[in-house]
């Protein structure tokens, strides 16, 4: 057909000159070749068989409509755009004799969701340079996978009541100048002698906790006991602070935004050819959020400083990344570098948008050994168990 078009334009130089006026500046040669054929096949319905089309600036309504239909058809064939059914039927009928041999294939959002649902979502770290940590299998209820830690939380967490009892034992040990026993979060105990009442205990850091020791006593009535917990560990005073409770109002005011974000990410995935390991999930997620005038909130912390982790799963070189938007938790990831951790977290967040629907819910998460409420983006079939521990106190973020 390309030869027929060239022959026709050679015989009609005025029509050829007019076509160059409607040739888009950024239009590729391949797209223009087929759109030009579309215009020529339907030009006689607008201008007659032998008439030369009027210049584009004359605002000829029928001609403008033809040019618009040509762009609709080209966008549908080469970029996968969809339009209302009457428009699609019209342009497909106008192009029924045009054979496009090298058009790309496109996957609709519904086809993509159906395909992913059929084969299931793998929780492996494919596409990331290193595999962060071992993971447990996903449950049958569609529970969100965590790519950097095991879902189960260590039984060695020290609750606030245990901290109070420990302080009492330490204080009593000072009065009697006997050995003091120190308990870390993994329930390993070690005896530390208190040889001098004015000396200061230097306790090593384990599993992200640094315990400062008591300072000396001057007299029986002037005993002072100070315990400092640095990094992510909480003090006994913080444990006694009242817990803020989220309400349905917090979820309702954020849900409309994530409904729009769901549609934006879904169409972005369709245009990118679907969810795959080679996709830049970080860029995709950030672009979609910024298009809705929002910001992707990124937090990093060394894995060893994150509370509620089994001690044998920590690594000195690993970094944890947590993603939020509108103060709502999206996902977590772990890697040897910040870039890798963010890439893993972004991929886990994008997986959410492959589901039929995403909702903002109030879920329980661990923070410094205690349960706190957090706003979490999940799919509608999610069961709120085994969520990874929080990097920051969720109730101080909102």
UniProtKB/Swiss-Prot annotation:
Annotated source species: Xenopus laevis
Q: What is stated as this protein's family in its record?
A: Belongs to the CARF family.
The entry's keywords: Nucleus
Q: Does the keyword Nucleus apply?
A: yes
Signal peptide residues on this chain, from the entry's feature table: none
Question: Which function does this protein serve?
Answer: May regulate DNA damage response and cell proliferation.
Which domain of life does the UniProt lineage start with? Eukaryota
In this chain the XRN2-binding (XTBD) domain maps to 19-124
Task: Give the subcellular location.
Answer: Nucleus, Nucleoplasm
Write out the biased-composition intervals (Basic and acidic residues). 131-147
Q: Where is this region: Disordered?
A: 118-245
Where the protein is mainly located, per its record?
A: nucleus
- Any one cellular-component term (Gene Ontology): nucleolus
Name recorded for this polypeptide: Protein CDKN2AIP homolog A
Q: Which segments show compositional bias classed as Polar residues?
A: 154-163, 189-199, 226-238
Pfam family, any one = XTBD
- InterPro entries under this entry? XTBD (IPR021859)
């Amino acid at each position: 057909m390309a030869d027929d078009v060239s022959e026709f334009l050679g015989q009609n130089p005025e029509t050829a000159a007019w076509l160059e006026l409607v040739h888009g500046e950024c239009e590729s040669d391949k797209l223009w070749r087929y759109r030009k054929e579309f215009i020529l096949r339907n030009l006689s319905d607008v201008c007659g068989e032998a008439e030369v089309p009027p210049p584009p600036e004359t605002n000829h309504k029928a001609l403008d409509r033809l040019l618009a239909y040509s762009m609709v058809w080209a966008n549908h064939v080469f970029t996968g755009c969809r339009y209302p059914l009457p428009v699609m039927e019209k342009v497909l009928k106008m192009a029924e004799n045009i054979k496009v041999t090298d058009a790309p294939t496109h996957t609709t959002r519904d086809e993509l969701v159906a395909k992913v649902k059929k084969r299931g979502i793998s929780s492996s770290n494919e596409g990331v340079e290193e595999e962060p940590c071992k993971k447990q299998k996903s449950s049958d209820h569609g529970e969100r996978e965590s790519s950097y830690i095991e879902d189960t939380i260590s039984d060695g967490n020290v609750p606030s009541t245990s901290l109070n009892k420990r302080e009492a034992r330490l204080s009593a040990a000072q009065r009697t100048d006997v050995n003091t026993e120190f308990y870390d979060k993994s329930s390993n105990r070690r005896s530390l002698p208190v040889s001098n009442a004015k000396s200061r205990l230097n306790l090593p850091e384990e599993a992200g906790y640094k315990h400062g020791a008591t300072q000396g006593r001057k007299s029986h009535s002037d005993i002072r006991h100070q315990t400092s917990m640095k990094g992510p560990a909480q003090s006994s005073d913080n444990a006694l602070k009242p817990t803020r409770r989220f309400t349905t109002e917090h979820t309702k005011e954020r849900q409309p935004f994530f409904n729009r974000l769901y549609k934006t990410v879904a169409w972005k995935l369709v245009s990118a050819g679907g969810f795959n390991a080679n996709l830049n999930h970080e860029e995709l997620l950030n672009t979609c959020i910024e298009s809705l005038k929002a910001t992707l909130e990124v937090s990093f912390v060394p894995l060893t400083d994150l509370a509620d982790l089994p001690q044998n799963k920590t690594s000195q070189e690993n970094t944890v990344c947590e993603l939020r938007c509108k103060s709502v938790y999206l996902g977590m990831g772990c890697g040897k570098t910040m870039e890798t951790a963010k890439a893993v977290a972004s991929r886990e967040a994008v997986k959410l948008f492959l589901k039929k629907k995403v909702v903002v819910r109030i879920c329980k998460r661990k923070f410094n050994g205690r349960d706190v409420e957090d706003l979490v983006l999940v799919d509608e079939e999610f069961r709120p168990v085994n969520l990874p521990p929080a990097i920051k106190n969720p109730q101080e973020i909102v």
